[in-house]
Amino acid sequence: MSIANIDALTRVIDHREIFHDEMLALMRRIMSGEMSPVMIAAFAIGLRVKKETIGEIAAAAQVMREFATPVAVPDKTNLVDLCGTGGDGVHTFNISTASMFVAAAAGARVAKHGGRSVSSSSGSADVLEALGAHINLTPEQVAISLERCGIGFMFAPNHHASMKHAAPVRKELGVRTIFNILGPLTNPALAPNQVMGVFHPDLVGIQVRVLQRLGSSHVLIVHGMNGMDEISLSGETMIGELKAGQISEYVVHPADFGLPVYDTRVLKVANKEESVTCIQRALANEDGPVRDIVLLNAGAALYAADVVTSITDGVRAAREAVASGQALAKLSQYVAVTQSFKTAV
């Protein structure tokens, strides 16, 4: 079933839901350049005001996956993505990027999907380049990197070329729309397991149900009660978990994992150079909040990847990976593997 653009706009203005097949058709028009920038903007804002439903988000994500340039990873065992929606306004160092090296060192296979900074001090791509990695890889090279060192970083612009039609609109609007929450739902390697941070507590229940519809296996959607799109060390974190088809929602606290409470301000950075320093300190096992928040989020990734059976066990495994030097070695290995593609050209 198709729906005219103006009919769809009228429906969202009237606070009525766009049906699944209609949303598929509308999103395909956006991704193929068949919808004007004015209509894209109006539709995105209309959805925002109405509040996007689980069905609408799932349909839009399905189309983004359909148009994405994929990374072929036939074996999905222990394959996990660590990412966030961004936009939390907290400006911490790149916690999920640091956690990626720890999780990989402890046995997870990490297919991380990310880009350059939009709202933070630095994006995962910016920081990985500053650490010495080569990020502009082909899908085949990403798959080889994943096979060789347990990490495959997918630079978002290389995999979502069709977003070029919506990107200028999104940038000019300057407010959150459905496009802000679609990126983390569209991993090009189709990682079945995921730790996703979200900028608003309402998104915890929404995103976990979207990923349930999209067929994910083991997912943790997290929102720190201080506003962080990570599992927080400053207090409670809301978690929506999808496991074996079932959803549970609960709250965790650093003390649950034997970790102290810290003020979030000690994790803030102003630029990518400061973020790189924090990552290096964490991987070098420097005691303190920078290391501890990486242990916590890497532990969650190990749990989502089904390497361990609880976040507590994940934190323990992450601690061992850092203390033994394996996490720091994983960073060096990843940089060497990605640079080998650059020199091979």
Curated annotation (Swiss-Prot):
GO CC aspect terms:
cytosol
Keyword Cytoplasm, does the record have it?
no
One example GO MF annotation: magnesium ion binding
Which Enzyme Commission number(s) are listed?
A: 2.4.2.18
Q: In which pathway does it act?
A: Amino-acid biosynthesis; L-tryptophan biosynthesis; L-tryptophan from chorismate: step 2/5
Q: Where are the transmembrane segments?
A: none
Any idea which positions bind Mg(2+) 2?
A: 229-230
Give, as one word, the top-level EC class.
transferase
One Pfam short name: Glycos_transf_3
- Positions binding 5-phospho-alpha-D-ribose 1-diphosphate in this chain are 84, 87-88, 92, 94-97, 112-120, 124
| Binding residues annotated for anthranilate 1, in chain numbering | 84
Q: An example of a Gene Ontology BP annotation on this entry?
A: L-tryptophan biosynthetic process
Which reactions appear under catalytic activity for this entry?
Answer: N-(5-phospho-beta-D-ribosyl)anthranilate + diphosphate = 5-phospho-alpha-D-ribose 1-diphosphate + anthranilate
Query: What InterPro entries does UniProt report for this protein, alphabetically?
Result: Anthranilate_Pribosyl_Tfrase (IPR005940), Glycosyl_Trfase_fam3 (IPR000312), Glycosyl_Trfase_fam3_N_dom (IPR017459), Glycosyl_Trfase_fam3_N_dom_sf (IPR036320), Nuc_phospho_transferase (IPR035902)
Q: Which UniProt keywords apply?
A: Amino-acid biosynthesis, Aromatic amino acid biosynthesis, Glycosyltransferase, Magnesium, Metal-binding, Transferase, Tryptophan biosynthesis
Family statement:
Belongs to the anthranilate phosphoribosyltransferase family.
Give the protein's recorded name: Anthranilate phosphoribosyltransferase
Q: What is the lineage of its organism?
A: Bacteria, Pseudomonadati, Pseudomonadota, Betaproteobacteria, Burkholderiales
